[in-house]
Regions:
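G-domain G4 guanine-recognition motif of GTPases
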Residues: 1-2, 128
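Gly/Thr-rich phosphate-binding beta-strand-loop-beta motif of the actin/hexokinase/Hsp70
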Residues: 56-80
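Short, structured patches in soluble enzyme cores that scaffold and shape functional sites
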Residues: 1, 30, 44, 77-79, ...
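ATPase catalytic-site recognition across NTP-hydrolyzing enzymes
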Residues: 3-65
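Charged alpha-helix within mobile-element recombinases
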Residues: 19, 23, 197-204
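A residue-level signal for conserved active-site and pocket-lining positions in enzyme catalytic cores
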Residues: 28, 66, 75, 124, ...
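Mg2+-dependent endonuclease catalytic cores in nucleic-acid-processing enzymes, primarily RNase H-like
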Residues: 84-199
């Protein structure tokens, strides 16, 4: 990047703050770096985990949803602080595999409404492949935004937000915290020149 004379120092500084880990080595230093180890290596519980949520502006809530059949189904409730930082302030986590019982769309929608406890989210962001669950939520009056499915773009985006301190997690979201600390690159795929995460600890 430093070889690009068209970039001002201000822009270079912004780019440096956006990337970390393998993406920093590739995009900023111009090095080929294999994707290995912890994906969100910038995640720091001292910086990103909150015990006090008194600074939240409780007006516009959003829910992100990872809908699973065998894998876990997760709802995360997001709200902004006065500073503009987004905070994941509540989680719902249910693994049909661990509980040895799958739930229906109706049961998950009932769980969502109970979990929201009267909160009406602006939008629920959900994988477009969860078509039947989306239909159930729309029937109940929720506004749906279909999530983008590009995994690497999502990883880069979340890593950038973490690196710049623009998102944080409540300490009442133990599964989300665990997954941020446990999400790793697939080293066998990396040896073949393919960047992809291990399909584990990727639900929250």
């Amino acid at each position: 990047m430093d070889d690009n004379l068209s970039l001002s120092e201000k822009i270079k500084a912004r780019y440096r703050s956006m990337y970390t880990g393998v993406f920093y080595r590739r995009y900023i230093l111009g090095l080929w770096a294999m994707a290995e180890g912890i994906i969100y290596d910038m995640f720091d519980t001292a910086r990103h985990v909150l015990s006090n949520l008194s600074d939240l502006v409780n007006t516009n809530y959003y829910v992100s949803c990872d809908y699973g059949t065998q894998n876990a189904t997760v709802f995360l409730l997001w709200c902004k602080e006065r500073s503009g930082r987004w905070v994941c302030c509540r989680e719902y986590y249910y693994s049909g595999r661990d509980e040895e019982r799958q739930k229906t769309d109706t049961e998950y929608a009932d769980d969502l409404e109970q979990w929201l406890a009267g909160i009406k989210p602006v939008k629920i962001i959900i994988d477009p492949s969860a078509a039947s669950f989306i239909a159930e939520l729309k029937k109940r009056g929720y506004t749906i935004k279909k999530a983008k499915n590009d995994v690497l773009d999502g990883i880069r985006f979340v890593a950038s937000l973490l690196n710049q301190g623009e998102i944080a997690i409540s300490d009442q979201c133990p599964n989300t915290i665990k997954e941020f600390a446990s999400y790793i690159w697939d080293e066998k795929a990396a040896e073949q020149g393919v960047d992809k995460p291990v399909k584990q600890f990727d639900h929250a």
